[in-house]
């Protein structure tokens, strides 16, 4: 289940992607398809086939973003969150072996292309919610339970 939450920055990036696809990339690819179609036989026309496929991919992504953005709830920073892990927090954790990780808890649609972002729906994020610095979070993993201590919590303030 995807929780329909997004940070303000994440929403703006999705909006930028939608605008880029719709106003810049789609018209450019449409011109290429039209040009390639004007050459005649489409069955062996690689330009036509490739750009037609790309146009379908763009349209699919535009439909997804449009539908997705209608349902997303933007979660802004609130001073009441300070000191505890909630949506949008940067969290630093450490295990008993001294291994540390730092990541931000964000919405599902924000995690792609970012190794330092995790989804609010992930087991790690669920285990960390409402924890404070010094608290122990136990995460169920395929290899068993893993224990992590919360070292730091930060929020991006507007």
UniProtKB/Swiss-Prot annotation:
Keyword Transcription found: yes
Source superkingdom: Bacteria
GO MF annotation list: DNA binding; RNA polymerase binding
Family: Belongs to the GreA/GreB family. GreB subfamily.
Alphabetical list of HAMAP family matching this protein: GreA_GreB, GreB
Function (record text): Necessary for efficient RNA polymerase transcription elongation past template-encoded arresting sites. The arresting sites in DNA have the property of trapping a certain fraction of elongating RNA polymerases that pass through, resulting in locked ternary complexes. Cleavage of the nascent transcript by cleavage factors such as GreA or GreB allows the resumption of elongation from the new 3'terminus. GreB releases sequences of up to 9 nucleotides in length.
Name the record gives this protein: Transcription elongation factor GreB
Source organism: Escherichia coli O6:H1 (strain CFT073 / ATCC 700928 / UPEC)
Underlying gene: greB
């Amino acid at each position: 289940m995807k929780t329909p939450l997004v940070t303000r920055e994440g929403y703006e990036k999705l909006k930028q992607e939608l605008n880029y696809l719709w106003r810049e990339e789609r018209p450019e690819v449409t011109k290429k398809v039209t040009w390639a179609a004007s050459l005649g036989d489409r069955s062996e026309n690689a330009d036509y086939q490739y750009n037609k496929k790309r146009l379908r991919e763009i349209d699919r992504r535009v439909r997804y973003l449009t539908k997705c953005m209608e349902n997303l709830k933007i979660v802004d920073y609130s001073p009441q969150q300070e000191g505890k892990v909630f949506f949008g927090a940067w969290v630093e954790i450490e295990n008993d072996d001294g291994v540390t990780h730092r990541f931000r808890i964000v919405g599902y649609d924000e995690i792609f292309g970012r190794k330092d972002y995790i989804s609010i729906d992930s087991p790690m994020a669920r285990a960390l919610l409402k924890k404070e610095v010094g608290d122990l979070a136990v995460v169920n993993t395929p290899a068993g339970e893993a224990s992590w201590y919360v070292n730091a919590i930060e929020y991006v303030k507007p």
